[in-house]
Each structure stands twice: as C-alpha cells, then as structure tokens.
C-alpha cells in the first residue's frame, strides 16, 4: 500500500485535485491493528487501491488522530474510513478484515464514488466546496456543531445539482431525466442514513465531552478543596506559632518580673538592715560609739566581701601566686599556673636560693603541713595553693617546729619544747644521785619562785580598778551575756523584766 507521507490537510488537497477517495487508516498497537495493516500491505489491496485512492495512516496516540476524531468519531481501533468528495464517509471498516474482504470493500467504494461523481458533474464548484470542508475541519479551533451543519448542507447538494442539470438540458426526453434521477435518489437516501449515524455519534461525542468537562470540573473542585484545606492548615499553624510566641513572651515577661521582684526584695532587705543599723546607732549616746558601730559594720561587710571575693577568685583563678619564706626571714614571690605541679615551684625556689640551704623541702604553716614526694607531683590547685599561698623553705634534717617565727614568745615556746626532754632527764639523774640536797634546792626554788608573786599581784591590783571602771562605763550602754557584751536597745528592759516558764512561753 502506498501511504501518503504528508499531513492530513495535504492529503485532502491531493484527493480533491485528483478526484480520488480519501482513505484514513487509524491503527494502534494491538494485534488487530497489526493484522489490518498486513491486509492493507497485501498486493491485491495495493493493486485495487492504486487508482482513485489517497490513503494515509495515523496512530491513535497522535495529534492528527485527535483532530480527526473530533469530526469522525473513532469507535474502535483499528478503523478504516473511505471519505468521498462531499466529506461524507462512503464506507467505514471497524476492526480487522482479510485481504479479500478488503478488496471487495474497495471495489464497492469505487463504484459508489463513481456514482457520486456522475451526479455531481453539473455543479463542480459545489463539489469542490464539499471536498474543502474536511480540510478545514482539521484545524484545532473547529467544533463538532460546525461540522454537523456542513454535513447537512452537503446532503442537500445532490437534489440541487439534479435540478440545475435538468434546467440546463432544457428539452431532453423524460426517460433520460428519469434515468438520471434514479441514482440521485439512491445517493440522497444513503447520505441521509449516514447523516443520522453521524448525528448520533456526534451526540454521543458531545455527551462524552460534557462528561469529561464535568469530571474536569469535579477535579478542579477537589483541587480547590485541597488548596482550601491546605491554606486553612497553614493558617492554623501560623496562629499556633503566634500563640506559642505570645506564650513565650509572656513567660519571659513573668520571669523578668520575678527577677525584678527578687531584686526589689533584696533592696528592701538591705534597706531594712541599714535602718536597723541606723536605729541602733541612734540609741548610742556618743558620736564616737556611733562611728565605731558604723565602722564595725563596714569592716564586717568589707570582710565578708573580701571572703566572697577570695572564694570567687580561688574558684576562678587560673594563676597561683606563691610566696616562699626563707629561714632567715626573707621571702620572694612568683606566679605559677594553677594546674602546674608543686615540683615546678620547688625547682623555681632551688634556682632562686641556689645551694644556700642544700637539699630542702616545702611546707605550709596554716594549716601546718610538710609536703612529701607524692605531693610534688600534684597540682597547686589540688593542694589548695591557688590563687595564693605562703610556703616555707625547710632545710634538710630540720623539723617543721624549728622554723624561726617573728614573735619572741614563739621562739621561747619552741626552745622550751626542744629542751624539755633534756631537762627532764637531768632532773631524774640529779634526784637519783643527789638525794640529800633536794630540800635546799626546793627551798631555793621556792624562794626563787616567790619573788615574782608580788609583782604579779601588784599588776593584778593595778588592773582591777581599770576593769571596774570599764565595767561601770559599760553598764549603761552595753548588756553583758557571759563574756559577750552587746549594745542595748529599747526592748532589752522588757526582756529582763519578763519571766519564762518551763515550756518556753513568756509571762509578763
């Protein structure tokens, strides 16, 4: 089969020029389409359709098939359409047929086409317009209603052509007119039936289009509903986020208010403490005592701040400031990292003092502790030598107790501690060897120990009047509780006059 290689409009124009039948073969991918294509490729079919036929083959998935189905509904695949000059299908083959059957159909279509061409010779211009109608129908913007109106006009062409041919002859015999009108009547009856079939098909096609539009409208409504729900969900999420942010801001505001309240309470407490101090100062009689009380409060506060500052510095400091005290009373200071071992400090001391004290060790006095070899491997922070500490350099073979203190009392105490064992041994030996002289010695000791007594008694006698005067002076302004004196207040008199019973309740 010689298939036309161009587009459908070009094939229609070629069929119009040659006055041939326009054949459209719609094929798919199924087995019947393959069989029908084989029938079209048969030699008999090719020979039968060689003249007066312009055939084109289109695929069901192509755009050309979609345009063609808008004018000529494709009910099944494969399908073969034989379209005449008027645009009306002369024959439609649905499904697959054998090659012999296809040859028979082709001869039948050729006879119908020849019969149609004989009846339309008188009105060639109208036949050309009928052929041009399918060509225009394949444009994308044409509708099924326009094709239906064109088909109805084409169906009315044969009677008009017959009438004009009769008027043109003007004197021919009635028998000839009758013989020319008989094929015209048959051709009019056949297009009317084809028109009804096409109207039904177009009606079905319109219903299908309406159904498709309805489904598309439903799909659009579903999409709109999905978008609406999505928008609603986004709005809810946005509102929830706003509420969460509002709650977070309210919580932060509440925490800030609590912090401000705590700060205000602390300020009030401090003010109360200051008021109490001022009230206590007002009860003092002299300006010196008031200033002394304020100075004591200030010193206590400074001491407390100093303790806090030192504890904070001890926790935060990364540098240890070590003071090395030498046996001769001199000292030197150096800073070390708080995580450095004690051995580093000892090496620094050894480099500084040189061989003056030979092999020495390190110790602290408060608390009293002499560092061992294991301690030299520990960090200064672990040994509580950070952020600052005072370390004593002890020469080798010298105990910790033999360190020279700046105080003379500490020296005599240290000497007494060292010499006490020797004195005890000497007393035992002397008592054992010299048994007679002990009474004289004791008397001498008594007499030697008696002279200091008058001095001590005189000192105590001198101190008594001073102590009495101090007590008399304190009697009005201070209240004694054991060995502790405190300032008097207005409530002290009531407390002294009140009595207390056994269950700690006060009786007025």
Curated annotation (Swiss-Prot):
Its main location: endoplasmic reticulum. Transmembrane segments: none annotated. Residues 117-196, 440-508 are annotated as: Disordered. Residues 1-200 are annotated as: Interaction with UBQLN1. It is a peripheral membrane protein. SUPFAM superfamilies: Thioredoxin-like (SSF52833), Ubiquitin-like (SSF54236). Pfam families: UBX (PF00789), UBX7_N (PF23187). The keyword Chloroplast does not apply. Residues 414-434 dip into the membrane without crossing it. It is found in: Endoplasmic reticulum membrane; Nucleus envelope. Residues 1-413, 435-508 are cytoplasmic. Keywords: Endoplasmic reticulum, Membrane, Nucleus, Phosphoprotein, Unfolded protein response. GO terms for cellular component: cytosol; endoplasmic reticulum membrane; nuclear envelope. GO terms for biological process: ERAD pathway; response to unfolded protein. The keyword Calcium does not apply. It comes from the Eukaryota. Residues 117-151, 160-187, 441-458, 498-508 have a biased composition (Polar residues). Residues 459-491 have a biased composition (Basic and acidic residues). The modification Phosphothreonine is found at residue 489. PANTHER family: UBX DOMAIN-CONTAINING PROTEIN 4. Directly interacts with VCP. Interacts with UBQLN1. Forms a complex with VCP and UBQLN1. Involved in endoplasmic reticulum-associated protein degradation (ERAD). Acts as a platform to recruit both UBQLN1 and VCP to the ER during ERAD. The UBX domain is required for interaction with VCP. This is UBX domain-containing protein 4. It comes from Pongo abelii (Sumatran orangutan).
């Amino acid at each position: 089969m010689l298939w036309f290689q161009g587009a459908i409009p070009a094939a229609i124009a070629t069929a119009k020029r040659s006055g041939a039948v326009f054949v459209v073969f719609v094929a798919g991918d199924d087995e019947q389409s393959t069989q029908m294509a084989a029938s079209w490729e048969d030699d008999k079919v090719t020979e039968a359709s060689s003249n007066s036929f312009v055939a084109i083959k289109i695929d069901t998935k192509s755009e050309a098939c979609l345009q063609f189905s808008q004018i000529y509904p494709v009910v099944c695949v494969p399908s073969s359409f034989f379209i005449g000059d008027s645009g009306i299908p002369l024959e439609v083959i649905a499904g697959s047929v054998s090659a012999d059957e296809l040859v028979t159909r082709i001869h039948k279509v050729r006879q119908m086409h020849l019969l149609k061409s004989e009846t339309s010779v008188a009105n060639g211009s109208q036949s050309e317009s009928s052929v041009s109608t399918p060509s225009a129908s394949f444009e994308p913007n044409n509708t099924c209603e326009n094709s239906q109106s064109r088909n109805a006009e084409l169906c009315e062409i044969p009677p008009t052509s017959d009438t004009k041919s009769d008027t043109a002859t003007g004197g021919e015999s009635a028998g000839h007119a009758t013989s020319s009108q008989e094929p015209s009547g048959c051709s009019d009856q056949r297009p009317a039936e084809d028109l009804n079939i096409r109207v039904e098909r177009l009606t079905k096609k319109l219903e299908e289009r309406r159904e498709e539009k309805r489904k598309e409208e439903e799909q659009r409504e579903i999409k709109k509903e999905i978008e609406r729900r999505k928008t609603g969900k986004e709005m809810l999420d946005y509102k929830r986020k706003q509420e969460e942010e509002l709650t977070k801001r309210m919580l932060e505001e509440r925490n800030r208010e609590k912090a401000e309240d705590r700060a205000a309470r602390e300020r009030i407490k401090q003010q109360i403490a200051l008021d109490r101090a001022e009230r206590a100062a007002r009860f003092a009689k002299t300006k010196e005592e008031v200033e002394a009380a304020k100075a004591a409060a200030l010193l206590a506060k400074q001491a407390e701040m100093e303790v806090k500052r030192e504890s904070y510095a001890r926790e935060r400091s990364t540098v240890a400031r070590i003071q090395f005290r030498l046996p001769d009373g001199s000292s030197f200071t150096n800073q070390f990292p708080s995580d450095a071992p004690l051995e580093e400090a000892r090496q620094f001391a050894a480099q500084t003092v040189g061989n003056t004290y030979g092999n020495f060790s390190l110790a602290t006095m408060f608390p009293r502790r002499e560092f061992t070899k294991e301690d030299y491997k520990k960090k200064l922070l672990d040994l509580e030598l950070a952020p600052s500490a005072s370390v004593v350099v002890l020469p080798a073979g010298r105990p910790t107790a033999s360190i020279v203190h700046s105080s003379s009392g500490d020296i005599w105490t240290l000497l007494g501690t060292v010499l006490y064992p020797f004195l005890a041994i000497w007393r035992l030996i002397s008592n054992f060897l010299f048994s007679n002289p002990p009474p004289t010695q004791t008397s001498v000791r008594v007499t030697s120990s008696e002279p200091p007594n008058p001095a001590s008694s005189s000192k105590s006698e001198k101190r008594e009047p001073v102590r009495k005067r101090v007590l008399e002076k304190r009697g009005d302004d201070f209240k004694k509780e054991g060995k502790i004196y405190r300032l008097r207040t207005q409530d002290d008199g009531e407390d002294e006059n009140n009595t207390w019973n056994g269950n700690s309740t006060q009786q007025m």
